[in-house]
């Protein structure tokens, strides 16, 4: 199918799929309908090698992500009282949502510099362990499509109709 439909929640994705099925006589499996994270996961699973991921990469939820951050900080002797793991987590996710890897983040503030170092160590752990957090799914998919012309062209040709539900809310 030539339809890509994306939304923010699983519930909204199911509703969107049901609406599309009622409107269009197409096998629903042929359409790509889901959340941003779900569709990015699908894309990365199909093109895991090009995205630099193992075929069976794990997805970390927020709790798992925080656990990895704490492990990184402990292994590197970083004081979790001075640098709160949840603040580090928010910093990392904000950077990824802005499309920035640790190597692309700059700051003149010492606290941010420490966060950037933790972010870099965290990235290395995820890469070594073959894992992605939620923000990483979006960033890797963006990087894959922006850097790989052949894959980007394939999806530009495949999807003639792109529906974004609740786009005005972004």
What are these regions (language model features)?
Residues 36-39, 88-94, 108, 140-141, ...:
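Short acidic/histidine-centered micro-motifs embedded in hydrophobic/aromatic stretches
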Residues 62-126, 130:
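Coupling/switch/interface segments within P-loop NTPase motor domains and analogous charged loops
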